[in-house]
Amino acid sequence: MKKMNLAVCIATLMGTAGLMGTAVAADNLAEFHVQNQECDSCHTPDGELSNDSLTYENTQCVSCHGTLAEVAETTKHEHYNAHASHFPGEVACTSCHSAHEKSMVYCDSCHSFDFNMPYAKKWLRDEPTIAELAKDKSERQAALASAPHDTVDVVVVGSGGAGFSAAISATDSGAKVILIEKEPVIGGNAKLAAGGMNAAWTDQQKAKKITDSPELMFEDTMKGGQNINDPALVKVLSSHSKDSVDWMTAMGADLTDVGMMGGASVNRAHRPTGGAGVGAHVVQVLYDNAVKRNIDLRMNTRGIEVLKDDKGTVKGILVKGMYKGYYWVKADAVILATGGFAKNNERVAKLDPSLKGFISTNQPGAVGDGLDVAENAGGALKDMQYIQAHPTLSVKGGVMVTEAVRGNGAILVNREGKRFVNEITTRDKASAAILAQTGKSAYLIFDDSVRKSLSKIDKYIGLGVAPTADSLVKLGKMEGIDGKALTETVARYNSLVSSGKDTDFERPNLPRALNEGNYYAIEVTPGVHHTMGGVMIDTKAEVMNAKKQVIPGLYGAGEVTGGVHGANRLGGNAISDIITFGRLAGEEAAKYSKKN
């Protein structure tokens, strides 16, 4: 097939789209392409779609236009490049581009940039809920009356950090696994995590002479969660956190940098060298290892109903593919790793009315499907009222700014140019403090020394959300901050750094003075970030009912579960949670399958 330069293609699209009556007038990409290609240029010879992941169709896109990396070279923008994706895995062309209907830019589900994609419409997530899908009685009954489409040992629902960890762990324990994902991209919320992976008494800490222990991590986690956490689950998290770091490292992860996150007594947030975002890196490593193991990954496929026999034992799961429709998979065990519900503001607001209308830092699939599936299977929910806001979501562009920026030395100031909080306090306290300021927002202020300490910051600068100036007065004028007061505030902060003690707000770490090179400001406001409540599990990741009885063959891991974090999650504990309990769920599900 002749390879078409994408820059030429886009120029043609932009120059002709909407000019009805011309040779290339079209309402969608299929109409545009058919004037230069035949239908079988995209589709299989029989005219059918290859699968729900659209594997063949995406291969055809690449054969014509090139890989995502190649396309990115021809679509550069001053601040952002939609094709230079920060997503891990192999991002499919059809994640954004549709053929026979209007396309939607997946980036718009989180960001507020103008990507101006040809033949596109405004982003809209309008999928039926699990309850609404129950109305598809005839289709569901027909699928269940048929023979199982597949027979495996374990089905994992959700391809975030917990799901991939579970799938790999189960596979390595001898199980045959199918991993399903309802979104067109992998990674869940894990791919967006930037701060670090908390773990205690690791080799990486020892190399930096950091004294830590599982007991101290346990204490910090319980305190951060207001002692509402399930102590047994927290003990699993803290005592196995080192093993999780070792497991990821053995698979190729770089977790050599160790920083501090809010609520931690010592530096225990592990991340790549130079302070790069941990989430996308971890998910990429997990994805690569899943590919090596030939794990069956099915995109655009929703887990709909856990199927049980007359004794209440799991026998499989009903799924719905975007194109294949309903079918069921026979399996001894099902692992729910579907994440939380922070993107579902209707659900969030019912549980915490104070968060009504808040935007969220989460990926669009985090609406609570797994909770509904678990409840319908008899699983109990706990701690649902505890919902966390992340304090630093950029007002411009909707970018979540990692806590590590504060951990590495940035300060928070209000429009009056004054500090108002210990910058690395727990997220609930920092969020409340920001909302109490003028305009319900604040500014992260830092210099080039902080920027150089954390490579993730260059991404924010590149996205245009971190204006810069060579003086604090100029920066203040640019951002509407009192420049004189800001200058005095930074001078005061630098004096506290020199003294080694923050007598103003009792910030426990003062890593560096802010006096090198240029200064930067990011306006931030809290956004709904993490839902601490979820499915009740035991220390084997087994889902339990309201009587705390195990549902045989049903497991849960990650943000879909409740009990680990209590009333408030500490930064850095999410990645540790999903890897630790994902591994555990996979191992236990594989063991269970062998016995049954």
From Swiss-Prot:
Catalysis: reaction(s): 2 Fe(III)-[cytochrome c] + succinate = fumarate + 2 Fe(II)-[cytochrome c] + 2 H(+)
**Induction of this protein: by what?**
Induced under anaerobic conditions in the presence of fumarate. Not expressed in aerobically grown cells. Expression is also regulated hierarchically in response to the redox potential of available terminal electron acceptors.
Which residues are heme c 4-binding?
A: 86, 107, 110-111
Residues binding heme c 2, per UniProt: 33, 61, 64-65
GO MF, one term, reads: FMN binding
Say which domain of life the source belongs to: Bacteria
Q: Which key words are in the record?
A: Electron transport, FAD, Flavoprotein, Heme, Iron, Metal-binding, Oxidoreductase, Periplasm, Signal, Transport
- Reported cofactor(s): FAD; heme c
Residues annotated for heme c 1 binding in this entry: 39, 42-43, 99-100
Q: What class of enzyme is it?
A: oxidoreductase
Residues annotated as region Flavoprotein-like? 143-596
Name by which UniProt lists this protein: Fumarate reductase (cytochrome)
Q: Which species does the entry assign this protein to?
A: Shewanella frigidimarina (strain NCIMB 400)
